[in-house]
Amino acid sequence: MGKKRKPSPERSSDEDEVSTPSPKDRTARPTAAARRENVALSQAVALSLEDASNFCSLAFSLERIKREPVDTDYDDPNQPGPSSVPVSARTDHVLPIRFKIKAEPQEYDSDEYGKDHGAVQIANKEVPAISPIEEVSQKRRGRPRKTDAAQHLFFPHVSIKQEPDDGFINFHESRCVGIAQDPEMQHLHDVNESHSSEIAIFRETKKITERKKKKTEAEKLWDNMSLTEKEVFQSHTRRRRTTRLPIIQNFEETEEGCIVEVPIPLIDLDNDAVESVTGPQHENVTVSENVLSTESTDQEVTETKRLHDSSRDFNPPRIQDTPSTVIRPEGDQKDPMSSTSSKRRNTNNSRCASLLSNPHSTPVTRLMRGILDSENSDNDEMLSNDQSEIAKRPRTPRPRYSPEAQRRTNSRLSALTIDTNRSNDLNVDGSAPSSSSAASCGLSTPDPDRTSQQRRKGNQSAARSRKIKTPSPPLSQEDEPMELDSDDDPVNELDNLPIVIDDPSYVLTKEHKEIFEQVKKSVSDRNEFSPAQISEIYRSSKGEQARLPERIHFGAFIMKTWYGSPFPAEFINVKKLFICEFCFFYARSDEIMQNHAKKCMLRAPPGLEIYRKGDISVFEVDGRLQKEYCQTLCLVSRMFLESKTVFYDTEPFFFYIVTINDDIGCHFAGYFSKEKYEPDVNNLSCIMTLPCYQEMGLGRFLIDISYALSRKEKWFGGPEQPLSELGRKAYGGYWRTTIASCLGRLKDELEFGSGISIKMIADDTGVNCHDILEVVCSLGWAKPVDPDEKNHYKLEWDVDWDMVSIILRESEASKETKVQYDPECLDWVPRKMRPSMDGYHELSKEEIEQDEQRRKSIQKTPVHVSMEKATPTSTTSLPVGSVKKELRSRGHNRSVGRNLKHEVNRKVKVPEWAAARDLTDEEITVEENKKQQKQNRKIFTRCADSVLDKSNIREETPEDDEPGPSTKPSGKRQRGNKCNNTESEPNPSGRKTSATSSGRGKYRNRRTDGTEEEEEDDDPTDSEPLTTDDEKPFETSVNKEKNEKSRRGKKVSKKRRSVAGKKFPPNFGVRDRDEPKKAENSEDGEGLESKPGPSTEMILVEKVEEEEAKVTVSDINMQASESKIEGIEQTSEVDIPKSDEDHQSTEAYDRVEDEVPITDYNIPTPDSYHSSPPHSPTPSPQPQLMQAQQNIYQDNDCHFAENDSKPPHLVSEVDDPAAPQPTVTLQSGPSDAPPLSHNSVDGYSTGDDDAPPNLSPQIGKSENNEEEMPLIAPIVQHNGITHHEESTAQHYHDSMNAGPSTSSHVTPQMSMINTTPQQPPFSHPNSQQQATPGSGGVPSCGPAYTHHTPEQQSQQFMSPPMAGMPASVASNHSIHNSNSIEMVGGPASLQHTPQQYEMGHSMAQMSQESAIGGINTVPSIEQQNQLMLQHHQFSSPPAAPPPSQQQQVVQPPIPPAPTTANGRRRSESAATQRTKARQQHQHQQQQPQQPQQRIAAPGVPQGVHPQMQFPMNAMNMMPAYPPFYPYTNYPNIWQPPYQNYPYNQVDYQQPWLYNNGHIPHQTNGTATNQFHPGHMGYFPNNNGR
């Protein structure tokens, strides 16, 4: 128990008498009229206190309110004045606060502050100004408190000016304006949020009312309230605290100054928080019983400052050396407030300010304060529908989400939430600390579940880790004992913090909880997705960003999103996200957004307005200064931009925001971002226009702004590359219009002057030179010609002025409806931004030089040095990389850190890094013999590498999957095996020839100096002139085979190179496996990279029987050297088991391949039919075509190390740079991206730059391009002659024949062949099927289809399932033969060979009898050639029809190709037998081939007659689309002629009437129109439109 303090001798009783109003003074208080006149003074008291050193401090004391109902008159002298509650206070349930204002004019400098600060003129009455000497303290039950300290309160300063008309004061300041208009109103205009958040000590009226009820009628209230009423009460009591200015309730003048009573809400004041506002100007505290004040003395400044620095806590220690100076007069020792103070439950103002409780009952005064304060305050705000001025008062809240700070976990903090660690009261930018910054403070409402010790420790440590406690001052014996403060007693902790759970009568029953859960679930189902729905949305997104949120409410628009955006998790699961269009505050419910709209003070983007014309404005926002705004802007833009990746790193960007202005504000419509620190790289990084504003031309307007800024910066800007589809559409339209306008101005200079350059156009438009060149070349207005020595080109202009005039007319017409840029309205000055301006470190020149030196020092070893070290020194050694590769191929997966030398012992030798040397023939022979003997004892296989290599090759150059001989130019020799020399045959050159031929594959590219030179063979037989098959007629004779044997291993072409002086043992090349890639690379320059491999290891295909393995290669070679018989006879004499078919010699296989008559498999290379002229129809041997085929076998032996090789080059390159890249097929669903419109010939949009109105997926299909029409289902009569089957009635479907009866796409080079009456390349219906690159090994033509991927199976052309696909799919595919399967995403320029076209034409011809009604429905070749080059405006990859839609066609017999076993060719004997059978079959087929074709199409000249799967039938029926169809780029589809077209009625009446208007299946859906490579279009299957 403590004692009372001694009265301080420093203060006299006279001062106390002056400061204590007597009953007489209270009776002389002004009336209501007088108070009305002095309202402004009370506002001055509250608003004129910003700096204590310059102005004044406000002293107040919180007076007690009697718990008993106040029914006496306020002016009754019998009632204690300060404790009496005025009538207005009782009515509004507010607490009157008394201020003592003491005048000390000498404290002010009259010259500095002038008359306005020296005195205040109010109602013709001069009142002295407020002096900065007042002190605030609170009575503590008539005794000192443990932690008595000054409660200082300061407000932003507002200059006071008198309004002579109404007598009120208008407060002016740069950031705060408030006018008191009504003296009776309970609230005033709010002070700016940035100045008042840290002093938000006032609450809203309803909350004040509830707190008053809670204080005065706690027991009665909670005993009589039902649960529903308590919940309503709870919702009111937890509303957010807002700032209000106090109003005057009473006013009186004294000798020393003015005493005013201001009703103030019941607040939680914090001592340390007030001290933090006070700062160093901490004043000495003196305790008074009635009205307390402070005096600032020079003697006490040092001690006071020390105490201030050491007691920055929410409960600072009381000042021990400042005893009370107030001495009561004798006879008046009793405190007038003693009766009230004795009933006070909690004297800690930082916990609960002036709370009353009944001593005979459990305190329930806080009413769920601890529970409710931890809930989200934003949800509370929506519970009020109050339309009062308090609710309408604008206020800028802190955004809900801030990526740079943690989310508030306990937002219901005290009203006065000030960060005590700050030395000043405002932030650097003038804003106040937010409520989240006080989360670290101990001012939050304690959790009732926590223990008393934890609660007390948490509050102490939150503000200050170490708390200095000073002993209490000595008390005199006269002082009666006093109790310790309630905060010191842990037992009384709950009494100090009364909450509703302390009330035993407050019980939540199970029924109440069930009702609450039902209501909560109902609201959740209405506004949020369930977990199951969220899971389904993420599952349907297939690994991509789920389209969440699905809808947004942005201003006056509700829009469906196009893509998902990474909003915080709690905002993702809502069905509709609400976003403020001014500040981008986002909320989960409409109630929260409505409440935010009442408080949001932003009506324009927080940046600098650089452009305004009419109702259009552009603002420049710095991503660093307005980080939260820009981050939310990026999150919003991600919902409409698929390629948006930057969300939170907004510091290095400027955001230029376009708004549409009205009376409400500047509404956000779109924006573009630009790099801040490197403005000369890209003038635009990201651009977005909201879908609701996409019809106004704002996209082009923003592009105009970006180029205007670049022109002011005096450099040629451009967008960041690569452009997206929408970006290319917008920029394409802008570039075309801008360049056309510039050319119109420069027409005279171009036509009649010296000409123009790209630089001139760039200077005029600001567009980058590369973009200008791309546009003018794509439009055909210019082309580069005449390159000079430096490869510089000149431009040859050929401007289509008609097109230019059309573009300019369209541009002029759009100015009436589209937003146009006006250069006169731009107010912007370029400035150079550096990272150092934003606080980032900027590298100096020295640091840049050091970084460059460090980068130069870190370089790779030169190639020739590394290759020299990696080269083995002998034939038995290999590079380490090869050792690792072989180990992996045999199932090993060993780490790099292991010692490979020990792990591969007895198999390979790890090379010793020494200089390479040449090996002699004897050394090579000895090593080879040893290797062969080892392999006879132990056989092992190595297939992993071959499988891997084949899979890699298949990705780039697909191979044959169907049986038949390979007709592709093989670039590699087939891999050998253990028994690959089981056949004895004459070899005049002996072992040296074999060794020379085989040795080239491995050592031809390797020398110590890294160079290459041609090989010099010492064999006299090799000096003979070599002859190739190109110089010989096509025949299969013994002499040819013998010559092939004699030329084995010789230098065939000049491209063969080897290291001079190297000699290799016989048959050394048989064991060559991996190195042939190096030979291919050196030969044509386009081969694969050379990879080191185990060349000396006998790599076998499969394990054979032990007795079969004993037949070694050396024994067979000895037999071959002794044998003198012919090659074919020798082949028949050698008996090889069938089990060893796959182990035949490479030489034998080569002979068999050479014997194959290539004449019937002449798939030409591009040179064969691009450069050579077409030929006559007479079939004859063609050495020109054969030359390309013979090159396959005349090259060096290393070409056959792999099973298969890349196919011949097709019509054009695989990666056609001129072909626009296709768009990925879009899935219909919630996450669909906006379907793109089609590009024109030049690759750019022909319409406006803005996105079309149907960009958003939710709009659905349009009537023009995506309407699904019922298909006509005629009974199709199949041609039995063509299909070799009976004609059967089938349901109509739009697929083509699977066999070669349907033709393929034709290239322009092939069109030239058609127009020339010369002989086409010789072809046979049994031509080998050729797989196109990227098809995964699937042949481009032929009856067999292998769908390797779901994409290929799903892309069914001219089939009913494709008709139902969206336009985004239908517009991104090209017309293609149903037999052609090209990879999705590849160029559409992969064509087929003329032989396939002729084959398809010949098989598709119909006789007169098989035609419709005896009429030949196949048009003449002249008619087809006229339609060749029509409709060439689409470019997309085709796909293959499904197997279910293929017509079964009996394919003509195809000679079977050597089947593969484990990736190897079969035996020579089997190949020889197949060769003989194939020769006989080909001779039988060659004779009737041409007459049969002539009979099939009499009157049509023999030539390439391709029939394409184009939507116009062979009878030249009218297009399926009417004239002026908006999407004219779609190819025309077969449809009956319209009756309003007379020429169709006259010309095609008979074919249409036949068979009820149905045409045969063979001709349905075919046409002869031709496209440019890479510009084939796909059309939807909407026949019958």
Curated annotation (Swiss-Prot):
Transferase is among the record's keywords: yes
Bias-annotated ranges (Basic and acidic residues): 23-37, 302-312, 844-855, 947-956, 1029-1046, 1070-1081, 1135-1151, 1196-1207
Basic residues composition bias: residue spans: 453-469, 1047-1060
Any single Gene Ontology cellular-component annotation: chromatin
Residue positions binding acetyl-CoA: 685-689, 724, 815
EC category name: transferase
Positions where N6-acetyllysine occurs in the chain: 644
Zinc finger (C2HC MYST-type): 577-602
A GO MF label: chromatin binding
Keyword Transferase: yes
Swiss-Prot/TrEMBL keywords: Acetylation, Metal-binding, Transferase, Zinc, Zinc-finger
Region (Disordered): 1-37, 279-491, 844-903, 927-1262, 1286-1373, 1431-1507
UniProt feature, compositional bias: Polar residues: 279-296, 355-364, 411-426, 977-999, 1185-1194, 1298-1317, 1324-1333
E.C. designation(s): 2.3.1.48
Domain of life: Eukaryota
Function per UniProt: Probable histone acetyltransferase. Required to initiate and then maintain lateralized gene expression in the ASE sensory neurons. Involved in determining cell fate in the ASE neurons.
Protein known as: Histone acetyltransferase lsy-12
Gene it is expressed from: lsy-12
